[in-house]
Structures are given as C-alpha cells and as structure tokens.
C-alpha cells in the first residue's frame, strides 16, 4: 500500500483490538461484553478535555445531538463499561481480533503494557471456546 509519508512495511507481530460499539450493543441490539477492561478513571478528565477540544466534532455533535451530549455520552458509557467490568468505576472495553494472519501467536500487548490497570474477563474468554450459535 502507498502511504503518506512513505513507510517501509511493518514485518512484526500485530494485535488488533475492537472497541466496544456505541450503545454497547450489536447492530441487531444484542448486548455485548468486552474481553478486556481498562481502568480509565485516572485519565477520564483528560479524555473529556481532548474530546471537547476537537472543534469540528464538537460543532457537528452539538448541532446534531444537543449541547455537549457527546461529553455526557463519554462519561455514561465509561461508567456502564466500568460496571460491566465488575472492578473499575470507569472503563473502556476491548476485544482482541483472531491473531491468525497478524501474529505468530495469541499475544495480548495491551494487557502486558497496562498490568493491573487492565483486566481480562474470564467468562468472556471461556465463552470463546463454545461454538457460535
């Protein structure tokens, strides 16, 4: 692929994480859980300020959804995901993509990097062993 600026291909293991969907549901309204929860309480204020500073997003969302509703949504969703975690007050949720084609083994660098600020949902992981309904 052509990139700007040009860059050499990255020939190392890669892990892809999927964020929780808006509303914490699939497009068919099925509730979802994360495989991995990250404690965001220590950085929530910083995330809120960064989101508020995104001028074009702020303008469009204020007009389309109401004054600062997206900031309230950030707080509400972080609290809901925190509740789902059973451990954190405020959290983000992530699910790891199947490693085949991206890395030689089933690696989890986010968990390794964050240590105790990250928790794997054992129930979610166990459910992965069951056939898809």
Task: Specify the residue positions occupied by each region the protein language model found.
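Metal-dependent de-N-acetylase/amidase catalytic core
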Residues: 1-133
């Amino acid at each position: 692929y052509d990139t700007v600026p040009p860059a050499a291909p990255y020939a190392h293991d890669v892990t892809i994480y999927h964020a929780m969907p808006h509303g914490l549901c699939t497009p068919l309204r099925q509730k979802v859980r994360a495989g991995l929860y990250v404690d965001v309480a220590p950085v929530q204020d910083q995330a809120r300020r960064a989101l508020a500073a995104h001028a074009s997003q702020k303008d469009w969302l204020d007009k389309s959804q109401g004054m600062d509703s997206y900031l309230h949504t950030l707080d509400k969703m972080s609290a809901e995901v925190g509740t789902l975690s059973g451990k954190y007050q405020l959290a983000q949720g992530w699910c790891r993509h199947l490693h085949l084609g991206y890395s030689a083994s089933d690696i989890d660098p986010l968990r390794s990097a964050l240590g105790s600020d990250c928790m794997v949902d054992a129930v979610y992981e166990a459910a992965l062993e069951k056939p898809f309904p």
